[in-house]
Each structure stands twice: as C-alpha cells, then as structure tokens.
Amino acid sequence: MSELFWFEKYRPRSFDEVVDLEEVKARLRQFVKAGNMPHLLFYGPPGTGKTTMALVLARELYGEYWRENTLELNASDERGINVIRERVKEFARTAPVGKAPFKLVILDEADNMTSDAQQALRRIMEIYAQNTRFILLANYVSGIIEPIQSRTVMIRFSPLPKEAVFARLRYIAENEGVKVSDDALEAIYEFTQGDMRRAINALQIAATVSKAVTEEVVAKALGMVSPRLLRETLYEAVKGSFGKAATQIYGFVADGGVGELEIIKQIHREMLRLDVQEYVKPEIAYIIAEAHYAILRGAHGLTQIYGALAKVRRLLKSV
C-alpha cells in the first residue's frame, strides 16, 4: 500500500471522476463552456467535495496551465487579511497563462474570517474583478457576510449519499489490494456520515490493521464500537437485561478503549433508528443530548450513559 494519503492520491482530476454532485457538475460545466464565470461561494459540511470541485474546475478551465493560473489560500493559515491582499495583488498583477481571460483564487475556510476581514476581502474581490475570479469555500454560509454572498453565486454541497461513498471506497480498495466487506463499509459510513475525506481516511487506517477490512477491524482501527454490537447492546438496555447491557458498555471502554464521547455519539444515532412511535424520538434525542452535554462539561461518562439509557428504558415502558 502506498504511504501517500489515499484521499489525495484518489482525488478526482475531472468532472467525470467526481462521484454524485450531478447538479453541481452541470452548473460548473456551463462556466467552462462559456469560458467565463462569476465569483463563487461553495458551502457545506467538511468532506463533501468543495475543495475537490474547485480544483477540478481549475483543471477544466485552464488545462495544463491550471497551476500557473490558480492561487490556493487558506484563511486560517494566512497571517491576516493584509497577507491575503498582498498575495492576491502579486498574483493578479501578471496576465493569465495561455488563453484564459482571468486567473482563479481559491480561498478555503472563508467563514473563519472576521467580519472586518471579510469586508476587506470584498474590496479585494472588487478591485481585481477584471482579471481574477474568487471561489470561496465555507462550512457555514451563515459565517459569510451578506455583501460577499450577494456578489457570488452560492452553491451548496450536501453530505454524500451512502451509495456514492461505498462506490468510491470499493474502487480505492480494489486498487490498493484491500478486501472490504459490506458491513465494514456500513461501519465507515456510520462513523463518517457522508464525509468522503474522513471515509477514505478511515478505510486507509483500517487497511493498516488488516488487508481484509471487516466491521470489527474498522471498529478497532477507529476507536468506535461495532455498530452491530452496539445495536444489540442498546436493545438489551431498553428491552432486556439492563445489567448485562451496562457490563457490555463498561467493556467497550475498559477493554476496547472506546471513549465515552464516541459511545454517546453512536448511541444518539442508533437510538433514533429504534422501532418506536415517531413522537417519542424527540424525547429520546433530548435525553441523549443531555448526557452528551454533561460529558462535554466533565461529568463521569459511564454514569451519564447509564443514566440516559435508564431514562430511555423507563420512557419506552410508559408509552
């Protein structure tokens, strides 16, 4: 197996290689066909393809000259708006290489910038609009000031569907000589929730443990509880022997080395899948959320987990 991070090794280089995101690809292809584009704002959760799509767009626009015509910046890494201004100024003052009518600046984590810094960024975008286009990347559109939102075409990126993640993971596993079971893919998706970057990283970590990646291997590698085993334990806790379930949960922590925070997160997801009346699920979610918050505040993790499960058990017996 290559030592290179698989997420970078298998990052798509063209629109055709990008899984899912059909509507986004269709819009960006129109810009490539026209040879022109507005400023863009890509927003959505981490690992949903924002950076990848920005780089693919650069490749499609500029071909072999995409590196010369593209400047990548990270708002968190740069030392303030003045550094960004100077780097953009230096980049924009030279003509695009090849036949491109403009250069491209990709600014990641733009929502981490202060409002004042974003106001300065807005002015930079206006000053260099004649020969430079910006693609801003953000996890939360609410973190971007309205004057920038109104000057960009906003494109939303959603968590990737399970089928798209599975297809990509199977492709990578086959290329790396790794066997991965369907249960392992389910466990990875459970852990990463549609974040492709985390899913690929999770597969690579699991593959360092064994070239035959199973659900158990994934759980061990990622420091989580096997989803199947957790479901059985939760069923025992709410409908069977509570003492037996408590012993199993203690084992997850003491023997398996799984953190209480990870367990409560997994419990939250699994509890909402219980076969119970829909009106009860918000109450269950609130009980688990209270325990989660208490653990974050420093309360004893196992005590909070046991208490939450006992409350859910009583609730389900009362309905």
Curated annotation (Swiss-Prot):
ATP-binding keyword on record: yes
GO molecular function, one term: DNA clamp loader activity
UniProt-listed InterPro entries: AAA+_ATPase (IPR003593), ATPase_AAA_core (IPR003959), DNA_pol3_clamp-load_cplx_C (IPR008921), DNA_Rep/Repair_Clamp_Loader (IPR050238), P-loop_NTPase (IPR027417), Rep_factor-C_ssu_arc (IPR023748), Rep_factorC_C (IPR013748), RFC_lid (IPR047854)
SMART domains (alphabetical): AAA
SUPFAM superfamilies: P-loop containing nucleoside triphosphate hydrolases, post-AAA+ oligomerization domain-like
GO CC annotations on file: DNA replication factor C complex
Keywords in alphabetical order: ATP-binding, DNA replication, Nucleotide-binding
Binding of ATP, residues: G44, P45, P46, G47, T48, G49, K50, T51
GO biological process, one term: DNA repair
UniProt family annotation: Belongs to the activator 1 small subunits family. RfcS subfamily.
Biological role: Part of the RFC clamp loader complex which loads the PCNA sliding clamp onto DNA.
Oligomer status and interactors: Heteromultimer composed of small subunits (RfcS) and large subunits (RfcL).
NCBIfam families, sorted: PRK00440.1
HAMAP family attached to this UniProt entry: RfcS
Name under which the protein is recorded: Replication factor C small subunit 2
Gene: rfcS2
